[in-house]
UniProtKB/Swiss-Prot annotation:
GO terms for molecular function: peptidyl-tRNA hydrolase activity; tRNA binding. Its EC number is 3.1.1.29. The lineage of its organism: Bacteria, Pseudomonadati, Pseudomonadota, Gammaproteobacteria, Alteromonadales. The gene is pth. It comes from Shewanella denitrificans (strain OS217 / ATCC BAA-1090 / DSM 15013). This is Peptidyl-tRNA hydrolase. The active site is at residue 22. HAMAP family: Pept_tRNA_hydro_bact (MF_00083).
């Protein structure tokens, strides 16, 4: 059984960013909300879009911060503090440069790897890195000086299809996480690669 009580999808707000690679975490939460048949609505006290969903009979909060990426922690901390949700009860979905498109992986803890959204969440959670992550592969531009433009750019259709397939699989793995446990969810997700 999962102890996850909050699932966060990282993004930049606004239509101009909606389809950019940096918003992959939000794509996952939107798909999860659709599968759970709930609607994310603006919640000013949590600085984001939020919903309450049920997965296999268990309540879980969904959140997409409406702050810019580097202020994501403000939104996550506001909701987590209000509902007394601990870092280890949080799953944060984010784009991951070090994983190719079409692959997604669960991870517990670790640093921020240069990801500004993760960096701010860690800071706002009192430097506690003990939350779960869903790392959605977006690939790497090959040159660290091109990273900013790359994450804020749109993927070509062939890559987008792979990312969408990995997100669909991540949603199925999340259902396994709530129905069974993280080990089974990881086994399912980590053996998947979109072709």
């Amino acid at each position: 059984m999962s102890n996850i009580k909050l699932i966060v999808g990282l993004a930049n707000p606004g239509a101009e960013y909606a389809q950019t690679r940096h918003n992959a975490g939000a794509w996952y939460v939107h798909e999860l909300a659709r599968v759970c048949n709930v609607t994310l609505v603006p919640e000013s006290k949590y600085y984001g879009l939020a919903a309450r969903a049920t997965l296999h009979g268990r309540d879980v909060r969904l959140l997409i911060p409406a702050t810019f990426m580097n202020l994501s922690g403000k939104s996550v901390a506001a909701l987590a503090n209000f509902f007394r949700i601990l870092p280890e009860e949080i799953l944060v979905a984010h784009d991951e440069l070090d994983i190719e498109p079409g692959v997604a992986k669960f991870k517990l803890g670790g640093g921020h790897g240069g990801h500004n959204g993760l960096k701010d969440i860690i800071a706002q959670m009192g430097n506690d890195k003990g939350f779960h992550r869903l790392r959605i592969g977006i690939g790497h531009p090959g040159d660290k000086n091109k990273v900013s433009g790359y994450v804020l750019g749109k993927a070509p259709a062939s890559e987008q299809e792979k990312m969408d397939a990995a997100i669909d699989e991540a949603v199925r793995a999340t259902e396994i996480l709530f129905k069974q446990d993280m080990v089974k969810a990881m086994n399912r997700l980590h053996s998947f690669k979109a072709e």
